Regions:
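Low-complexity, intrinsically disordered or signal/transmembrane-proximal segments
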Residues: 7-8, 15
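Catalytic, metal-anchored helix/loop core of enzyme active sites in primary metabolism
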Residues: 14-416
Length: 416
């Protein structure tokens, strides 16, 4: 079986301008994508954008990029944006809102490539509809593959269209596997920085503050993903993503702690050879790779090889970071368990950030939610979303119980 890295491509269309949609245009991935478009104006054109709740940035982007469609979160904001665009003489721009607005952005007939970067399951329906509409998709949204990876990858195979990972680790795996066959792969190694608590004794975890948990040693990211990195749940999600993207069982996806974050992933082959991908820690590089695949084009991003002094690796401590263990269990079960893992984590992290529960309660909420989730496989996106809603309800009840029965130390809340 050939890896899902080869697709029929139109040689004549390979080098023409790529017309893109950005789901999550005001977030960090969206801004990095627009930076690339700005650097390569002869290569890319922005056709549509989903801006979420950031009305000010949406207006500025609409004026600058002049997309055919722009979507915002709420109907009220859509009305305001439409009026502002009319005043600016840009009334030709179609303004949409809500989940269906995201779908309109992702499925616009002029779009070739969709960058899926809306955080959470809010981007799930639009991403699936983009795949269903025959678009090539660059995935920066972990939740899509964690919650509905089986459905999305199956549809991509039906459409014979690529799902190109933007997540740096999976992008690295994709590059290492390029041109290979799945039978040749012994295992995949996903590297983890270890987060801010790599060397913190487990005995001190009870007093971890939000401020400490948000202090990631390598990456500057959003709050949820930064907390997920602190618990290693982010790496657990990546295990599930890798299983779905590369059609491999969980036992072939390994996590290795690599504090320098120099190597993004490694692929070990059956003959004992190991390929590793090294690059600067700049998300523009994996985005550029996804946007230009199967080509590679020149960029100014360079890794200073001469400054490389050491590479450290050691196995993760599953007892210290139980979220990683829970993710492997969910990866093995798939279906509703994976959905519940993501939903419960989002609820638990939000509660921790608010100071309602302690850092150690995050895996407790997730594990209890998984216990209360029946093992089955939703067969449609609507059923996935329904399962997600139920899991969130369960997780909220568990959080409420913990908040009522435990006294959260002031040190566990963000210092105000």
């Amino acid at each position: 079986m050939v890896l899902c890295l080869r697709y029929q491509t139109d040689e004549l269309n390979l080098y023409r301008m790529k017309r893109i949609a950005i789901l999550g245009s005001t977030g960090s991935i969206g801004r990095s994508t627009l930076s690339i478009v700005e650097s390569y104006p002869e290569r890319f054109a922005v056709i549509s954008m989903a801006a979420g709740g950031n009305l000010e940035t949406a207006l500025a982007d609409a004026k600058l990029w002049k997309p055919k469609v722009i979507s915002v979160a709420k109907a009220e904001d859509a009305g305001k944006l439409k009026a502002q665009l009319q005043s600016a003489g840009l009334d030709a721009i179609q303004v949409e809102y809500g989940p269906q607005g995201n779908v309109a952005v992702a499925t616009h007939p002029d779009v070739d490539f969709v960058v899926s970067a809306i955080v959470g399951v809010a981007g799930l329906e639009a991403t699936y509809e983009a795949v269903k509409a025959g678009k090539s998709v660059g995935l920066a949204n972990k939740e899509c593959l964690v919650a509905a990876g089986e459905l999305i990858t199956a549809e991509a195979r039906r459409q014979n269209k690529p799902l190109l990972p933007i997540d740096s680790e999976h992008n690295a795996v994709h590059q290492c596997m390029r041109g290979g066959r799945i039978e040749e792969v012994e295992r995949v190694w996903l590297t983890a920085s270890g987060g801010p608590f790599l060397h913190t004794p487990k005995s001190q975890f009870a007093s971890i503050t939000v401020k400490q948990a948000l202090n990631h040693p390598t990456w500057k990211m959003g709050k949820r993903i930064t907390i997920d990195s602190a618990t290693l749940m982010n790496k657990g999600f990546e295990v599930i993503e890798a299983c779905r993207l590369f059609h491999m069982p969980p036992e072939k996806i390994k996590v290795i702690v690599h504090p320098q974050s120099t190597i993004h992933s490694l692929v070990e082959f059956v003959d004992g050879s190991i390929l590793a991908q090294l690059s600067v820690t700049d998300m523009r590089l994996p985005i550029l790779y996804a946007l230009t695949w199967p080509e590679r084009i020149a960029s100014e991003l360079r890794f200073p090889v001469q400054e490389l002094k050491r590479l450290d690796f050691h196995p993760p401590d599953m007892e210290k970071f139980p979220c990683l263990r829970l993710a492997y269990e969910a990866a093995e079960a798939g279906g509703a368990k994976s959905i519940a893992l993501n939903a419960a984590d989002e609820v638990a992290v939000a509660a921790f950030l608010e100071g309602s529960i302690a850092f150690l309660d995050i895996p407790r909420v997730i594990e209890q939610t998984l216990r209360e989730t029946k093992d089955h496989h939703p067969e449609s996106i609507s059923k996935v979303l329904s399962e997600d809603s139920q899991a969130r309800h369960t997780a909220v009840e568990i959080v409420d119980h913990l908040a009522k029965t435990k006294v959260i130390s002031p040190s566990a809340a963000l210092t105000r």
